[in-house]
């Protein structure tokens, strides 16, 4: 089973360019998905990545890469990964819904002016 990394291109603490390079070097065969991961709170203060649907965060990229390496050495449980995948998808769906409602509200206020 291929490893999967999810990294954010919007969070302040994530340096997308260097993190992506390090993850590719660690596992060239892994699938890397770039985009908002709806993990904004921790993403303001810590660099993070989802490794096989499990969130990992650290204050520095070096610390994060140590955690990623440890996580990749652990045995994988397909049922647990599926549960985590569903949880992540639900979190993303809720964030998109909140964003949509906020845009509608702002659009409505603008129209009232």
UniProtKB/Swiss-Prot annotation:
Protein name: UPF0741 protein SE_0364
Location of region: Disordered: 68-113
UniProt xrefs under Pfam families: DUF1450
Family membership noted in the UniProt record: Belongs to the UPF0741 family.
Coiled-coil annotated residue ranges, if any: 78-113
Keywords from the named record: Coiled coil
Transmembrane segments: none
UniProt keyword Ribosomal protein, yes or no: no
Biased composition, class Basic and acidic residues, residue ranges: 68-102
Basic residues composition bias: residue spans: 103-113
InterPro entries: DUF1450, UPF0741
Keyword Transferase in record: no
Domain of life: Bacteria
